[in-house]
Amino acid sequence: MGVKNTERKKNMMEVKDLMTKDVICVDKDVDLKHVLDLMKKYEITKIPVVENKKLLGVITDNIIAYKLGSIRKRGVPASRLHASSVIDKEFETVEPGTDIKTILGKVGAPGPTILNVVENEKLLGVITKADLLPLVKSHSKVASIMQKKLSIVAPDDRVIHARRIMIDRNIARLPVVDHGKLVGMISDTEIAFALAELKKSIPLGQQKHHLDELLIEDVMKTPVTWVNPDTSVVDAAKIMMENNIGSLPVLENNKLVGIITRTDLLKTVNY
């Protein structure tokens, strides 16, 4: 019995085995422009905020997009907002020795999408859905897990329209479709960058008008990496890891038929 338990523990994967150790983090007093610059440089959407190495919270592209688009913050450029003004203090922490199975059980559940790995109040790393993708091994077809009920927008729709859909339906990104053809993707990240640029370059008195008229085609991400329904789940995970993206549209005969996210892929993991 003791030997079996020892073997099971030996084979058990822990958070420290998959977490990102070289964490990009910021002090609470840095300006929001610096935060956005880091997100763009390292292609990340979440950054822990610290003070004297103690974790205070997390900043996400979602929160930045919301804050910069809110009426109260209109006219205030990102360079004049501090990280502390957009920090999410409702964060979760885990210890480095936590069983990965415990983390997988949280995937898809309401709550934070980044877990901060802390020991003795010191931030050692973070673990996100992207870090868990190497666990995906299923050879089932993407068609068996893809989301078929889609929310889409057109390139000539306004950015504020896309943002409203994302808030109301609690989704992080939208496919952009023009006359049945997928032409781009828009997410919290693109919206946050666009709002920051608008506030920097447009005079205060004209910002509301420009924001109301800002079109999706002006900020959407293109070209789009996609898969077909017959792509295997494990290959889809590899594509996400190679391209550092959180979702993949599914096309069949050049028609958008579904979408898969990291969450969809991780739900196939039997660990």
Region roles according to the model:
Residues 41-65:
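Generic amphipathic, hydrophobic interface segment in small proteins and small subunits
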Residues 114, 173, 189:
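RNA-contacting regions in translation and RNA-metabolism proteins
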Residues 26-43, 50, 93-111, 118, ...:
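The conserved cystathionine-beta-synthase
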Residues 2-22, 60-91, 100, 104-108, ...:
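Tandem CBS (Bateman) regulatory domains
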